[in-house]
Amino acid sequence: EFSFNGKVVLCYPKIKDGGIDAVVDNFVREIKKTTGVKLVKDRLKDGLFLGLHVEESTKKGDAHIVLYVDEYMLKEAYRLSVTPKRINIAASTPAGFFYAFQTLKQLMPRNVMAGVPDDSVEEWRVPCVFIVDEPRFSWRGFMLDEGRHFYGKEEIKKIIDVMAAYKMNRFHWHLTEDQGWRIEIKKYPKLTEIGAWRDSKVCAWGDVKPDGVRYGGFY
C-alpha cells in the first residue's frame, strides 16, 4: 500500500498542451479538503530529468506521485502504477492525468470521492495496483433538460462532479425552448422576464391540477 500520511511530493513536468497546472492544483486542493494531507508540489521545467530528480528525492525517504508524459498514448488514456513508495502516472494530455486522478481518488476511502472530510480515518492509504485505461468512445455525454425543470447552479456543479467521476466528457445543457428560457440575454430581457417563468406547475403523475405557485428561474 501507498500511504499519504507522511510527506508526499507530487512531481510533474511542463507539457506543451498546457493545462497541467490546473489539473494538479485541483487534485491537491481536493486531497487537502478531504484528508487534511497537504501534498508538496514540485514542478520541473524539463521533463527529461524528471526520473533522475525523483530518484534523488526518494533517497531522502519521501513518497512521490510522479506524472510522466507519454506522447504515444491516446488523448484521454492514462497508465497508473501504485507501489509502496511511489505512484507513477503516465498520460499524453491534461485530460489523461485528470482521469487518472479520478481513479486514484476512487481507490482511497469513500469520503474522498464524496468531497467531504472524515475524521475517523487514521491513515490514508491506496492499494498497490497497475491500471492501463483508455476510453472506448470519444464522446461520453450527459444531457440535462432545464427547459422544463430548473435545477440551479449548485445542483449543476454536483452533476458535473459526478460526470467527472464517471469520466464523462460532454455536458449537453438544454436551456431554451417554449417551455422555459433559462439563459439571460441583456438585449432581449423579456426572454427571461416572461419566458423563464410559469404561473404554476403540475406536481405529480395522476394529479393534473396545477398548484398555483409561480415557478421558474434562469442563469
Model-derived features with residue positions:
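Single-residue recognition of alpha-helix capping/boundary positions
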Residues: 16-20, 155, 187
